[in-house]
Amino acid sequence: LLLSSALLLGCLSACNTSPRESKVMEANDGSVTTIESNGNKLTVCDLSAVKDTIEVPLSEFVEDCRIVRFETSEEAYFKAWFINATDKHIGIRQGNQDVFKLFDRDGKFLYNVGSVGSGPGEYDTTLYDECIDEKNGHIFFTPFVGKRIMMYDINGQWIKDIPLPMQINKAKIWVNEDGSLSVVHMPFEEGEPLAFRVDTEGNILNQIPATAATKVMNFDGEVFSYRNCGDFDFFHTGID
């Protein structure tokens, strides 16, 4: 790692013929090295040199842990892409445009939510996110790309598509206390909403416009939201 840092510093110096001031600062035990060049810092940790370690028990991060054995009937089989566990349900979002599956907390298969296709209540593109709203008995889907949010009841039956005035790309969704939906996605144009709040009729209630720094150029990035802090946390790889 230290050799890589030295090579990187050499490359930085070679890329620009203007004078640069650089210095190397090391931690007391030698495991961490910070290379500063013209006001920019690169920190490298050499794990082989770390002498002072601590053990962090899993209980520091996890309150409860259980093993769920899923039903093994043919209709219950899935290839999980993402798993969404709520107080009463476990939702399985599959890749390759496969149908979304809903289980109870004991692994019993309940329903397919919607179906693959281009008709009412169907989706013909890969689902990018879902939100299970147990309080109001709804399930919402956002497509990989599109101009709608799909709304179902908790039994997997389609209610309606919520129309949107703009295209959403790789959108993540969250249900607020008032029943409105918060959405974060990847905007391609400055001024388009980066994040917005919408009601179930498709009316935009609030929005945060994208700036030159928060728009994206392609679909290479991702938006992640793990919902493990009781709020709508997200990580936008294109801008974070």
Q: Where do the PLM segments sit?
A:
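Sec-dependent bacterial lipoprotein signal peptides
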Residues: 1-13
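Eukaryotic scaffold repeat domains enriched in small/polar residues
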Residues: 15-240
